[in-house]
Curated annotation (Swiss-Prot):
Function statement: Molecular chaperone that promotes the maturation, structural maintenance and proper regulation of specific target proteins involved for instance in cell cycle control and signal transduction. Undergoes a functional cycle that is linked to its ATPase activity. This cycle probably induces conformational changes in the client proteins, thereby causing their activation. Interacts dynamically with various co-chaperones that modulate its substrate recognition, ATPase cycle and chaperone function.
Keyword hit for Transferase: no
Organism: Oryza sativa subsp. japonica (Rice)
GO MF, one example: unfolded protein binding
UniProt subcellular location: Cytoplasm
Protein name as catalogued: Heat shock protein 81-3
GO cellular component, one term: cytosol
Motif range (TPR repeat-binding): 695-699
Residue spans of biased composition, Acidic residues class: 674-690
Gene assigned in the entry: HSP81-3
Tissues/organs with expression: Expressed in callus.
Example GO biological process: protein folding
Length: 699
């Protein structure tokens, strides 16, 4: 009975991806086999996990295997597994109508010059079959459904048919590739064996190749008589009897037989001793584990024995994955095995979020085989394993730090993770702090560690100074650094958004308190003369401070004479426990922020004025002469808004600020106000002409 065939269109992005794969020249097409074997291994993991709680799941096919069958007669290569299989809806959704988030991202990565071998990292490895095949047929049987056949030549559509007449799989999936004429090398036994060794040697299920074996069999002429009879007829030869006797004994014929040949006989690499494993073997294992096309940066292979037993191999990649901090995706970087049986990946309880970039495997002797995700959360053994893994990861980072070049690569890729670790991991905070690196006022183009900073501290210096901001360029000429630089103190530039969170938790390093250059309460060592001079200036400018506070009202909490600004007229500092300007910027950028919290944390600004600055001195004279002078009010507003910008805050009303600047330009250029009165109808008034002439003087 012929089954009905349904035709489906490929989802648009998948169609695009297929035409990219088919129409672009890629030199390393061989990765298709790695991807298909990797998918088979995942399907086998799933059925093995299901069978831990329900043994009957394996009834249809008790053996777990991957078979590879090259057929030179039909130019097809088949990859068969006894994994979980797919239902009809799985087939339709997973192979064509629903694009994974990785589809688009993979195409963007390809366009940016990435290697096609990255395909597996984006979850679309199946489509790599079209690198070598013009037609792909997928036959699959799931325990909960009948057997179905998926077929496509990638011409925009695929068909799905119920399979009533084909060979019954029992359970699992068979992918048959009809190879392109120029890709027939993938039917050669030697080539397939090399590829499995290169990419899939460490898959934990037997991968068997259907091989042709030719044997020479010795048989006597009598046995061979029947076969040869027809051929011998009519052939007359004069042979000597003795020779004939010899021939009879030594007759050989070639016999062709087929057999399965297991290609990955290695025992799991983590069960071997680290000293016996070569760098190349670790690299091959890492690649097969992660689908990465590059080698790892560093590896840690260890076992823990005693009350608790487990073995683990941890790898640090060379670069961060494209979706490292995508919270919607569970990172599946550590695979959990129990007594060599794969249990699950993306086990969140095994490693904290800040280490989500570390990849590897853990094989426990003590966990129960039928452990569920729910049980994992309460499991004491797992908590101990996790603690050990974190400790070993930190050790591994210190090992990487011994090589400056490697550590620079590592830090560029994963510094955010270390800073997240400072924020989240109170146990290891002081250790992680030693791994941090920053630019500073004295480090030039190099990065410096907190340890190195401490060794360079001035005599009598008891605090570590830092400034946070949007970029190195934005902070290196900040008014907050003027006094610190003048006195020769080194200041660390913390210009990563996550630094704000990290430094909030890292209060001190080696007993030295971390102090922000942008918050109030910055105390610098001063001589008696400096202190005396400061007191005099405070007294002298007290009146101006009051006037400025009256003009600005609740825009600032208070106005004080500064001892941190040397050249700039003024700056705005935040309370010791409030948000810095940079933190305010970060919080404003968060779509789901709590605005009531923002109001509370960000309203405490103190204006610090520089008594040594000519503008401030002139302003003081005017305020002393007439505290109701209208030009003073305008100048104070302009100085406040400029200070907002130079101190790293954003302007609430940039238009008014712009208008003030334009007004100043007109005054400077002696443009008559009446000429452009219409254009400036909406501008806040600069009051009267007397004010204008006074402003000109200041300018």
């Amino acid at each position: 009975m012929a089954s009905e065939t349904e035709t489906f269109a490929f989802q648009a992005e998948i169609n695009q991806l297929l035409s990219l794969i088919i129409n672009t020249f890629y030199s390393n097409k061989e990765i298709f086999l790695r991807e298909l074997i990797s998918n088979s291994s995942d399907a086998l993991d799933k059925i093995r996990f299901e069978s831990l709680t329900d043994k009957s799941k394996l009834d249809a096919q008790p053996e777990l295997f991957i078979h590879i069958v090259p057929d030179k007669a039909s130019n097809t290569l088949s990859i068969i597994d006894s994994g979980v299989g797919m239902t009809k809806s799985d087939l339709v959704n997973n192979l064509g109508t629903i694009a994974r988030s990785g589809t688009k991202e993979f195409m963007e990565a390809l366009a940016a010059g990435a290697d096609v071998s990255m395909i597996g990292q984006f979850g679309v490895g199946f489509y790599s079959a079209y690198l070598v095949a013009e037609r792909v047929v997928v036959t699959t049987k799931h325990n909960d459904d009948e057997q179905y056949v998926w077929e496509s030549q990638a011409g925009g559509s695929f068909t799905v048919t119920r399979d009533t007449s084909g060979e019954q799989l029992g359970r699992g999936t068979k992918i048959t590739l009809y190879l392109k004429d120029d890709q027939l090398e993938y039917l050669e036994e030697r080539r397939l064996k090399d590829l499995v060794k290169k990419h899939s040697e460490f898959i934990s299920y037997p991968i068997s190749l259907w091989t042709e074996k030719t044997t020479e069999k010795e048989i006597s002429d009598d046995e061979d008589e029947e076969e040869k009879k027809d051929a011998e007829e009519g052939k007359v030869e004069d042979v000597d009897e003795e020779k004939e006797e010899k021939e009879k004994k030594k007759k050989k014929i070639k016999e062709v037989s087929h057999e399965w040949n297991v290609m990955n006989k290695q025992k799991p690499i983590w069960l071997r001793k680290p000293e016996e494993i070569t760098k190349e073997e670790y690299a091959a294992f890492y690649k097969s584990l992660t689908n990465d096309w590059e080698e790892h940066l560093a590896v840690k292979h260890f076992s823990v024995e005693g009350q608790l037993e487990f073995k683990a191999i941890l790898f640090v990649p060379k670069r961060a994955p494209f979706d490292l901090f995508d919270t919607r995706k569970k990172q599946n970087n550590i695979k959990l095995y129990v007594r060599r049986v794969f249990i699950m990946d993306n086990c969140e309880e095994l490693i904290p979020e800040w280490l989500s970039f570390v990849k590897g495997i853990v094989d426990s002797e003590d966990l129960p085989l039928n452990i569920s995700r729910e049980m994992l959360q309460q499991n004491k053994i797992l908590k101990v394993i996790r603690k050990n893994l974190v400790k070993k990861c930190v050790e591994l980072f210190f090992e990487i730090a011994e090589n400056k070049e490697d550590y620079n690569k590592f830090y560029e890729a994963f510094s955010k993770n270390l800073k997240l670790g400072i924020h989240e991991d109170s146990t290891n905070r002081t250790k992680i702090a030693e791994l941090l690196r920053y630019h500073s006022t004295k480090s030039g183009d190099e990065l410096t560690s907190l340890k190195d900073y401490v060794t360079r501290m001035k005599e009598g210096q008891s605090e570590i100074y830092y400034i946070t901001g949007e970029s190195k360029k934005a902070v290196e000429n900040s008014p907050f650094l003027e006094k610190l630089k003048k006195k020769g103190y080194e200041v660390l530039y913390m210009v990563d958004a996550i630094d704000e969170y990290a430094v909030g938790q890292l209060k001190e390093f080696e007993g030295k308190k971390l102090v922000s250059a942008t918050k109030e309460g910055l105390k610098l060592d001063e001589s008696e003369d400096e202190k005396k001079r400061q007191e005099e200036l405070k007294e002298k400018f007290e009146g101006l401070c009051k006037v400025i506070k009256e003009v600005l009202g609740d825009k600032v909490e208070k106005v004080v004479v500064s001892d941190r600004v040397v050249d700039s007229p003024c700056c705005l500092v935040t309370g010791e426990y409030g948000w810095t300007a940079n933190m305010e910027r970060i919080m404003k950028a968060q779509a789901l922020r709590d605005s009531s919290m923002a109001g509370y944390m960000s309203s405490k600004k103190t204006m610090e004025i520089n008594p040594e600055n000519a503008i401030m001195d002139e302003l003081r004279k005017r305020a002393d002469a007439d505290k109701n002078d209208k030009s003073v009010k305008d100048l104070v507003m302009l100085l406040f808004e400029t200070a907002l910008l130079t101190s790293g805050f954003s302007l609430e009303d940039p238009n008014t600020f712009g208008t003030r600047i334009h007004r100043m330009l007109k005054l400077g250029l002696s443009i008559d106000e009446d000429e452009s009165a219409e254009a400036d109808a909406d501008m806040p008034p600069l009051e009267d002409d007397a004010g204008e002439s006074k402003m000109e003087e200041v300018d």
